[in-house]
Design a protein with these regions (language model features):
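Short, small-residue-biased leader/transition segments that mark boundaries at the very start
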Residues: 1-2
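Local beta-strand N-terminus motif with an aromatic residue
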Residues: 94, 114-117, 159
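Mid-domain Rossmann-like dinucleotide-binding core that forms the NAD(H)/NADP(H) cofactor-binding site
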Residues: 24-100
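Short amphipathic alpha-helix with an adjacent loop that forms part of the alpha/beta core around
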Residues: 103-114
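N-terminal Rossmann-like NAD(P) cofactor-binding module of classical short-chain dehydrogenase/reductase
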Residues: 117-120, 142
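C-terminal hydrophobic helical "lid"/dimerization subdomain
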Residues: 177-229
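Glycine-rich phosphate-binding loop and adjacent beta-alpha segment
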Residues: 126-192, 228
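Structured surface patches comprising rigid loops and adjacent beta-strands/short helices at the edges
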Residues: 5-13, 17
């Protein structure tokens, strides 16, 4: 039997009602998506406030965020550069799929049409700046990733004229009580309804091909590696 000793604050007990496959399929992506939603709700986000937009929608964090938000009663808009995945995104719970190509990111206004009560951003850069300019008053953005850029060129207008909140989601430094609560909810009211559909199981020897797909931007959802296959 193989084992490794790690510091106690690195690990969280698997919650009751969750199996090993679900825990690995959720992984850091699922935890991060759920943490973002928990923090947004703590900041006042509720389904009645308006729709939530999710960028990087076909990725692991985006896919799980769409599924969980939909299950919690939110109207979800999926923002993607992969228009051919619209069917997949709607199956996860997106009420609308918006093409990233439809945005004119070269002319981002300090304030644009207010559209979103919440936003989960996996891209950074111009998309995050556009999101900030299009939030409803009192809206909340969860900044998770930098798949497009780690830079952010925006104005203070959304924050001081619409009261928009920008939350940074750091999944690696969450206090243990909050980590336990997030995982508890992932096994309960925030359990994704389509985890199996968004997850592929691969043998270890298949990983090089999967990595190639990731580098080409062709991957979607989650991958679980079966070391026994």
């Amino acid at each position: 039997m193989l084992f490794r000793s790690v510091p106690a604050d690195w690990v969280v007990p698997m919650p009751k009602g969750m199996n090993l496959f679900e825990a690995m399929a959720l992984g850091t992506a699922g935890y991060t998506a759920a943490l973002a939603i928990v923090r947004m709700e703590a900041n006042g986000l509720a389904p009645a406030n308006g729709p939530v937009i999710v960028s990087g929608a076909t990725g692991g964090v985006g896919s799980i965020a769409i599924d969980v938000l939909s299950r919690l009663g939110y109207r979800v808009v999926a923002l993607t550069g992969k228009e051919n995945e619209a069917g997949y995104l709607k199956k996860l719970g997106a009420g609308e799929v918006m093409s990233r190509k439809s945005l004119d990111l070269s002319k981002i206004k300090p304030l644009d049409k207010a559209s979103w009560a919440g936003a989960v951003d996996n891209l950074g850069g111009e998309v995050l700046a556009w999101m900030a300019s299009t939030m409803l008053p009192g809206g909340t953005i969860a900044s998770i990733g930098l798949a497009a850029s780690m830079n952010l060129n925006t104005s203070v207008a959304p924050f001081i004229l619409r009261g928009v909140s920008l939350l940074g989601i750091d999944s690696g430094a969450t206090p243990m009580p909050l980590r336990r609560e997030v995982w508890r909810r992932l096994a309960g009211d925030m359990r994704p309804a389509h985890l199996e559909e968004m997850t592929r199981t691969l043998a270890f020897d298949d990983l090089p091909r999967a990595f190639d797909g990731l580098l080409k931007g062709a991957a979607r959802g989650r991958i679980v590696v079966d070391l026994a296959a």
